[in-house]
C-alpha cells in the first residue's frame, strides 16, 4: 500500500509539472 501511495504521489507530481 505504501509503495502504491508513493507511485501515485510521484505520478501526480509529474502530471502537475506537465500541466504547468
Swiss-Prot record:
Keywords: ATP-binding, Chaperone, Nucleotide-binding, Stress response. Induction: By stress conditions e.g. heat shock. Belongs to the heat shock protein 70 family. This is Chaperone protein DnaK. The keyword Chloroplast does not apply. Acts as a chaperone. It comes from the Bacteria. Signal peptide: none annotated. One of its GO terms (molecular function) is ATP binding.
